[in-house]
Regions:
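Structural signature of the two symmetry-related core transmembrane helices
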Residues: 52-66, 275-291
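Conserved MFS/SLC helix-loop-helix module at the cytosolic interface between two early adjacent transmembrane helices
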Residues: 36-75
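Helix-loop-helix hairpin linking two adjacent transmembrane segments in secondary transporters
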Residues: 115-170
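Extracytoplasmic gate region of multi-pass secondary transporters
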Residues: 5-6, 204-259, 318, 322, ...
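Helix-breaking motifs and short loop linkers at transmembrane-helix boundaries and internal kinks
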Residues: 17, 49, 70-76, 87, ...
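Central cavity-lining transmembrane alpha-helices of secondary-active solute carriers
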Residues: 28-42, 248-261
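Juxtamembrane intracellular "pre-TM" segments in multi-pass secondary transporters
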Residues: 169-211
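Cytoplasmic helix-loop-helix junction between adjacent transmembrane helices
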Residues: 80-120
Length: 395
C-alpha cells in the first residue's frame, strides 16, 4: 500500500484537494502510528506466539488498505494511514526476530538479504501494477481507489500463510554456540521488561549509533519516494501509469545489489564485524550523493539513472542492519531492539522529515526540497553508523 501511495499520490492529492505538505504529512503520520505500535507488538512478541500476533496484525493492515480506497477527505485518509500503520507495525519487531531464531548465525546476513529482496521486488512490481490498474480502470480522477481494493486481496491470503508458519525456538543458535545445546523450557528466563530492555540497549554503543544514524536518515528516507512521484507529475506531466513504471525501474538495480551486499556482508563480518557496519554507513552516504545528483538533472534519463543507483545503495545498506542487531543485542531483547529501529526511522526522522520536505516542496518545488533535505540526512546518518562500527567487537 505504501507503493500505491507513492505512485498514486498526485491522483489522491487531486481527488481529495490536498497540498504537498498535507499529502506527505499524512504519509508520515502513518509511519508515526506504525512506530508507536511497534513497542506493544514487541511486548506481545516476547510473551506469545509470534506468528499468531503477526498474522492478526496483517489482517488489520489488509482491512485498512481496502478502507483507504473508500476515503472521501483528508481526515478519513489519516484514519486509513493510521490503521495500516498499526497493522504493519508488527513486522518491524517480529519478522527479524523470527529470522534470527530460524537460521544459523553464520548465514544470517544472506538470509536477511534474501528477506530484504521483498522490498525492491515490491517496488519494481508494485508501481507498475498500481499504475496499470488505474489505467485499465479508466485513468479517471477517482480510479486510484480500485488499486487499494485489489491490493487488499493478496494481503488476506498472506494472513493465513503466516498463521500456519512454525514458531522457532528463541535463541536456539546462540544457546548452542555458547552452551553446546538448547536450554530446557524450565530453565528459560522470563521475558525482559520493556523498561529494562531499553535501558540496557542504550549501553550497546554500536546499536545506539546505528539507530540514531538511521533516524537522521529517516528525514529523507520516508519523504523521498512520494516527493519524486510528485516531481514526475509536476515537472514532466506524467500520469499514474508512466510514473509507476519509472518508479519500478528505479528499484531494478537493487535486485542485484542486495544479494551481493548480503554475501559481502557475511564475508566482512567473519573477517572483522565492524567492517560490515562500516559498509552500511558508506552505502547510506552514497544513497544521499546519488539521489541529490539525480534530482538536479532535468533530463529524465539522467535523473532516473542516479535515482536508481541511490535506491540500490539504500537497499544494499539495510542488509547489514539485521545481522548487526542480531549479533550485538541479547536474543531476549531482539524484538524490542528492532522496534526501536522503527521508532527512530519514522518518529525521529520520518514524520518531521515529511513535514519539512512538504513545506519546502510547497514553497520552492520538489526538486529544491529534495536538494535541501537529502544530503545532510544521508551524510550525517551514514557517518554516525560508521562511527558506531568502532564499538562492534566490544558489543
Amino acid at each position: 500500500d505504501r507503493v500505491a501511495i507513492t505512485v498514486l499520490g498526485p491522483d489522491i492529492q487531486e481527488s481529495l484537494n490536498i497540498s504537498d505538505t498535507m499529502l506527505l504529512g499524512l504519509g508520515s503520520f502513518g509511519g508515526v502510528v506504525l512506530v508507536l505500535s511497534t513497542i506493544p507488538f514487541a511486548w506481545l512478541a516476547d510473551r506469545y506466539r509470534r506468528v499468531g500476533v503477526l498474522s492478526i496484525a496483517t489482517g488489520v493492515w489488509a482491512g485498512l488498505v481496502a478502507f483507504t480506497g473508500a476515503v472521501q477527505n483528508a481526515f478519513q485518509l489519516a484514519i486509513g494511514r493510521a490503521g495500516t500503520g498499526i497493522g504493519a507495525g508488527a513486522k518491524i519487531p517480529i519478522s527479524p526476530s523470527l529470522i534470527a531464531d530460524q537460521y544459523p548465525i553464520a548465514i544470517r546476513a544472506r538470509i536477511f538479504a534474501a528477506e530484504a529482496l521483498g522490498r525492491p521486488i515490491g517496488q519494481v512490481i508494485g508501481p507498475f501494477i498500481a499504475g496499470g490498474i488505474v489505467l485499465i480502470a479508466g485513468d479517471g480522477p477517482d480510479d486510484w481507489r480500485v488499486a487499494f481494493y485489489l491490493f487488499s486481496i493478496p494481503a488476506l491470503i498472506l494472513v493465513v500463510a503466516i498463521f500456519l508458519l512454525k514458531e522457532p525456538v528463541r535463541g536456539a543458535y546462540e544457546q548452542d554456540a555458547v552452551l553446546g545445546g538448547k536450554l530446557e523450557k524450565a530453565q528459560e528466563e522470563p521475558p525482559v521488561r520493556l523498561s529494562s530492555a531499553f535501558q540496557r540497549l542504550k549501553n550497546v554503543r554500536s546499536f545506539y549509533y546505528l539507530v540514531v544514524g538511521i533516524g537522521v536518515l529517516g528525514f529523507a528516507l520516508v519523504a523521498v519516494p512520494t516527493t519524486v512521484s510528485l516531481l514526475l507529475e509536476e515537472y514532466y506531466d506524467y500520469g499514474a501509469f508512466k510514473r509507476g513504471w519509472l518508479i519500478s525501474i528505479s528499484w531494478a538495480a537493487a535486485l542485484i545489489a542486495i544479494p551481493f551486499a548480503g554475501k559481502l556482508g557475511d564475508k566482512l563480518f567473519r573477517q572483522d564485524p565492524k567492517k560490515a557496519l562500516w559498509l552500511m554507513g558508506l552505502l547510506v552516504a552514497l544513497y544521499g550523493v546519488f539521489v541529490t545528483i539525480g534530482v538536479r538533472f532535468t533530463n529524465i534519463v539522467l535523473l532516473m539513472v542516479f535515482y536508481t543507483l541511490g535506491n540500490a545503495c539504500q537497499g544494499a545498506a539495510f542488509t547489514q542492519m539485521g545481522p548487526t542487531i542480531s549479533a550485538v543485542v541479547p536474543y531476549r531483547m531482539r524484538a524490542q531492539a528492532f522496534s526501536l529501529v522503527g521508532v527512530y526511522i519514522f518518529l525521529m526522522g520520518g514524520f518531521f522529515g515529511g513535514l519539512l520536505t512538504g513545506a519546502f516542496s510547497d514553497a520552492y518545488g520538489e526538486r529544491t526540497a529534495l536538494t535541501i533535505v537529502v544530503p545532510p540526512a544521508a551524510l550525517i546518518g551514514g557517518v554516525l553508523i560508521m562511527y558506531g562500527s568502532r564499538f562492534m567487537k566490544r558489543d
